[in-house]
Amino acid sequence: MLIFRVFLISVFLVVLQSCSYNPDEKEKSIDLDEINRRGKLIVLTENSSLSYYEYREKKLGFEYEILDSFAKKMNLPLEIKVVSESDKLVKYLKDGEGDIIAANLSVSLSNVQDIKFTSPHYSSPQVLIQRKGKKINSVQDLDKKTVYVRKNSSFQKRLEYLEDEIGIDINIKVYEEDPITEDLIELVDEGKIDFTVAHENLARISKDLYENIDVSLVLSFPQKLAFGLRNSSVDLKSKLDQFLNEYIRSEAFTQLKRRYFDYAVSELPVNFIPKKGKLTPFDKSFQNVVKNSGWDWKLLAAIAQKESNFNPQARGMGGSFGIIQFMPATGRKYGISPSSSVEQQLIAGMKLLSSSMDDWNKIPDMTQRVKFTLASYNAGRCHIEDAQRLAKKLNLNPLIWDGNVEKAVLKLRNSNYYRLPIVKCGAYRGHAAFYVRRIFEIYNGYKAMN
């Protein structure tokens, strides 16, 4: 019985993921009436693939889309504040700088953080993030392994509990720079650390962004995930709970889950194996589409492999579709839909890429211009222009992608940089750097096979 009580205490004392605060701080009393007078609902969040991000100039994120639907129902504009230091989320909430925390929060005892949790919007177990290949297959294999986690996170507490529960010695390392979980996943993918822990919902998204990771080892039972609110926001909590309890049973929520967690890109077959005289399943289509465009068909093929693995029926995160993953609004602009033929999709893609290429006509070197085009296709032009301005400030060349703007775009995840006045579009995860690099790896491989 004593062991069971210790277990319950360890579970309930799971804190919000790095959202620490000073318990002596008094919170501002702000509820729905004042929010309505202010005329907007403010969400404090992280720049992550699950909570909030911008992709191809569209605001996305599983939690963002839930709260966007809620705000529309309340007839309130939604304002997003990205907080780079996750340990400040609760402080900013209590200070009245935002009304809701959206950061994939595990539900814990409210008095641990002195905030309230909404009704859960999802539940997800914790899983081990490791690289493919020499992976471990059981929790016992974590003995003597080094696992990096966020300070005071539910992941740290879970690993400590596993040590006591099954008698193993895990070398738990707290990453001092206050990263978000996705930063640690990226470090695993790059081989800089071997293991970290994440909730399975974020891990499912991440394994399609980071090709080297495995997320199959489950470390816990499903944990409830919710939004965080001030204690004083009684009416806001009542309205949001009512909305969530209805929304999670709706077809709209079912479709939202499909778009983020069950999309087909993650279940594509093994990469097409080039055969003699044929590099891809659609060589002739690629060759036909690039005629008179100045583009190498192998480069367009590399984009298609990276985007969909040559699957014209692929559906991606946020609703993207097709062989080169058009966002729905962009597809409508270019006259295509998920039912369009491969050649129609490629023709539209070529028009889009050629138009984007024209936007970068001040880049003198053609290869570099192509890389800027690919980067803006992935991230949206605004983030890449931010990276150019930042590159200039850092004494890098704003007209060269390799080792210059490429470096600057990675710095846009850091608040020391994305809060600079020259940065117009805010925080960005930096995925464009990896996107461009991967496409050129595929492209160079195709050229070597010629």
Q: Predicted regions span which residues?
A:
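Extended ligand-binding regions for polar small-molecule ligands
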Residues: 20-26, 64-73, 132-154, 200-202, ...
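Extracytoplasmic small-molecule ligand-binding "clamshell" domains
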Residues: 21-105, 109, 113, 172-179, ...
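Bilobed "Venus flytrap"/periplasmic-binding protein-like clamshell domains
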Residues: 42-51, 56-72, 106, 127-179, ...
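Periplasmic-binding protein-like
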Residues: 45-48, 120-133, 200-242, 263-271, ...
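A ligand-binding cleft/hinge motif common to bilobed small-molecule-binding domains
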Residues: 87, 103-113, 160-165, 186-221, ...
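Export/targeting segments at the very N-terminus of extracytoplasmic proteins
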Residues: 262-310, 343-346, 360-361
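Substrate-binding/active-site groove segments that recognize
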Residues: 313-337, 342-355, 439
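Catalytic and substrate-binding regions of cell-wall glycan-acting enzymes that process beta-1,4-linked
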Residues: 374-445
